[in-house]
């Protein structure tokens, strides 16, 4: 049904307050998922399967804590469960999904306005790389890519979730490609995150790792800028970036490069990147002050999710 939490999907956040059973497998109930923990799954019995005893009842009380390796404990539970009809519950999720689809997703991937936007870029890449492993860095591109990419296979996304590890994406993409050499690996990274581990372009060059890098350049630390816009009256503090010349950096590491900023360039540039046998850096200059929704304001219950 999608992702839960601050920038998760509409349906799981809205239905969090209505569920009567919530099964959490190996999770830490961090604030990016729970929002206000006192209102998380407030009407549900919570079953928490966890290998680390320190995580049990740390932030959210578990009615049924199950301590152990989930490879052993989960089958012990599932073998005792009989199949039930949840069609009515699933239909309620579909109603919420359709709201998000119509109000958020379809407008975000539509090719309109003077500037490219992150949602349409993710959608366009997904159409041509339908068997790719998706890797994200941290920030707005992480939210767009994780929610809008069209996954057709398991084990196809590597992202650091709510840990906020800027710079994670580039080295993670290198590892993903080495671990799965027969699959394309597409990295979505912002201009701020790329500069955290920019030196790993040298690793790509030295080791000949053909990672496809989609650089979403909006000239901001976009996620922090969005918070400053929405909650601090547009008082932008240390979020606007003066970037280096990414073309010179790519060329200096012998990595093919292209920069685009128009809708009519997008599909052809992605095709060029896909056909390239080596690594490729595609810089996409996107709308500078685009916001990513849905969003749960900090400290609020997850069902208080905003669509705008």
Please state what every model-predicted region is.
Residues 24, 48, 134-136, 187-188, ...:
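Structural beta-sheet core signal
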Residues 1-93:
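Glycine-rich, acidic loop regions that bind phosphate or pyrophosphate groups
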Residues 88-93, 137-138, 283-284:
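Short coil/turn segments at secondary-structure boundaries
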Residues 26-28, 50-52, 139, 193, ...:
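Anionic group-transfer/hydrolysis microenvironments
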Residues 98-176, 182:
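Active-site diphosphate/adenylate-binding microenvironment
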Residues 20, 26, 74-85, 97, ...:
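Structural signal for hydrophobic packing residues in well-ordered secondary-structure cores
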């Amino acid at each position: 049904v999608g992702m839960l939490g601050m920038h998760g999907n509409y349906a799981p956040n809205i239905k969090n307050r209505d569920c009567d059973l919530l099964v959490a497998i190996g999770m830490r109930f961090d604030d990016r998922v729970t929002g206000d923990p006192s209102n998380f799954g407030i009407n549900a019995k919570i079953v928490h399967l966890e290998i680390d005893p320190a995580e049990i009842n740390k932030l959210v009380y578990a009615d049924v804590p199950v301590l152990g390796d989930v490879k052993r404990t989960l089958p012990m539970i599932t073998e005792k469960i009989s199949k039930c009809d949840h069609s009515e519950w699933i239909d309620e999720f579909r109603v919420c999904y359709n709201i998000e689809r119509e109000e958020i997703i379809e407008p975000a991937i539509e090719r309109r306005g003077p500037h490219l936007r992150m949602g349409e870029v993710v959608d366009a890449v997904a159409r041509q790389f339908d068997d790719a492993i998706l890797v994200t860095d941290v920030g707005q591109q992480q939210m767009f890519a994780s929610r809008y990419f069209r996954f057709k296979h398991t084990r196809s996304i590597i992202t650091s979730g709510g840990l906020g590890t800027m710079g994670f994406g580039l080295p993670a993409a290198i590892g993903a490609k080495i671990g799965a050499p027969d699959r394309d690996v597409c990295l979505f990274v912002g201009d701020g995150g790329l500069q955290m581990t920019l030196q790993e372009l040298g690793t790509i060059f030295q080791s000949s790792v053909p990672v496809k890098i989609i650089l979403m350049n909006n000239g901001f630390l976009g996620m922090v800028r969005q918070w400053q816009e929405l909650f601090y009256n547009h008082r932008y503090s240390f979020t606007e970036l003066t970037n280096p010349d990414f073309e010179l950096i790519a060329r200096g590491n012998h990595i093919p490069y292209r920069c685009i900023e128009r809708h009519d360039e997008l599909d052809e540039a992605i095709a060029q990147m896909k056909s390239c046998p080596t690594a490729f850096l595609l810089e996409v200059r996107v709308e500078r002050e685009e916001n990513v929704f849905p969003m749960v304001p900090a400290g609020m219950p997850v069902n208080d999710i905003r669509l705008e």
